[in-house]
């Protein structure tokens, strides 16, 4: 009898130790390793999204080369760094004010910049200043490289100022365009007409409305990135009292908008190809199977990683768009 009791006690001890080991193991898995400050700063800029500004610059530069058959690689480098810096600045300011305004909290926010990256509020403010200075340096280098006062005063400075104001005012006080339903329009203008035209002017030294028209298809795919993000955040934005297009439309209508953005992007791209009788402009058509996959993922409400996937799609769309523009040279 005593032998049986001892065996039972030993069995219980083994079971308890096994449970303790499993508990410790699960706790260790839940505890994420600390992020270095440098990595935190990099993640705060949302590096996965920065390809958006790159593709806008590439489309504008490709169009410029098609029109004048000249190319300034140094100017391209300057405007690429400037565009990426400006977008990174907007991303960090967006994270900062979303947290300040209560849209993002540690418990519910998908954007972890203010919570998990080991950065203090002071670190974020310093990063904002650093990116501001970097943008100013790129603008100065661009002006110096162009050496065309009339073009700078009439085109570059107005476009740059307008784009900067829109970018910062997306979430920053006193306007907060995102919170009054104008976020989609803001992103469309910043990464479509404004940035594509700026890249075009930096190469040609003149303004052409053609750049605005050619920016539209890519801009629509970029708006799709924001649209997914805002659809995912409908509940959080509504609780914070923010009004976004997604929160006003509801999920079902957001789904139709998401699909419609791609549909209109391709329709407009096809129109551009008809205008110049160069169907190579429709090169992004090869992405349609991937787009259908993303639309189905949206329909099934699997939005967790859809923002990143939509951003990747926009990058490939823009890259193929730029190649199509180059290949459409007369």
Curated annotation (Swiss-Prot):
CDD domains documented for this protein: PT_UbiA_UBIAD1
Localisation per UniProt entry: Endoplasmic reticulum membrane; Golgi apparatus membrane
Transmembrane regions listed in the UniProt entry: 39-59, 73-93, 124-144, 156-176, 180-200, 209-229, 254-274, 276-296, 310-330
A matching Pfam family: UbiA
Entry's EC annotation: 2.5.1.-
Membrane topology, from the record: Multi-pass membrane protein
Family: Belongs to the UbiA prenyltransferase family.
UniProt xrefs under PANTHER family: 1,4-DIHYDROXY-2-NAPHTHOATE OCTAPRENYLTRANSFERASE, UBIA PRENYLTRANSFERASE DOMAIN-CONTAINING PROTEIN 1
Protein name, per record: UbiA prenyltransferase domain-containing protein 1
Organism (species): Dictyostelium discoideum
